UniProtKB/Swiss-Prot annotation:
It is found in: Mitochondrion inner membrane. It comes from Mus musculus (Mouse). Residues 1-28, 102-140 are mitochondrial matrix. Keywords: Acetylation, Membrane, Mitochondrion, Mitochondrion inner membrane, Transmembrane, Transmembrane helix. Belongs to the TMEM242 family. This is Transmembrane protein 242. Pfam families: DUF1358 (PF07096). Residues 1-20 are annotated as: Disordered. The gene is Tmem242. It is a multi-pass membrane protein.
Length: 140
């Protein structure tokens, strides 16, 4: 007599997709990508500030302190603009991603991938030999 349930090693349709190890891997990957992006943004901002200070230190120092003519310093204005710009960028990408997700009517990343493959043409894969650097860089 056959059983209707899944055997060992098989998954039923009612179970949550993916094992806990897969979910943990995705969470770790998301944390890694988020921290790498944050580190890149911070490095870019610090590099830009140090370059501005190196280029003209007297103007940089004038911009760090508020005066009677300027009630807000230039650096605090720049930080506020960076914060609002980052917020708008994150929210904008999230809204666009959510709108595309809902417009396509997909429920998982596998559905999204198959939908994208059906919409866009396939990318041809050439197995030709790679060009040699001597050939590419050779003068006429």
């Amino acid at each position: 007599m056959e059983t209707s349930g899944p055997g060992p090693g098989e998954s039923s349709e009612l179970e949550a997709p993916g094992s806990p190890d897969d979910r943990l891997f995705l969470v770790k990957g998301g944390i890694f990508l988020g921290s790498a992006a944050a580190a890149g943004m911070l490095a870019g901002f610090v590099t830009t500030l140090s370059l501005a200070k190196k280029k003209s230190p007297e103007w940089f120092n004038k911009g760090t302190m508020a005066t009677a003519a300027l009630p807000e310093s230039g650096s605090s204005l720049a930080l506020r603009a960076l914060g609002w710009g980052s917020l708008y960028a994150w929210c904008g990408v999230g809204v666009i991603s959510f709108a595309v997700w809902k417009a396509l009517g997909v429920h998982s990343m596998k559905d999204f991938r198959s939908k994208m493959q059906s919409i866009f043409p396939p990318i041809p894969k050439n197995h030709e030999s790679a060009e040699e650097w001597e050939e590419v860089l050779k003068w006429k």
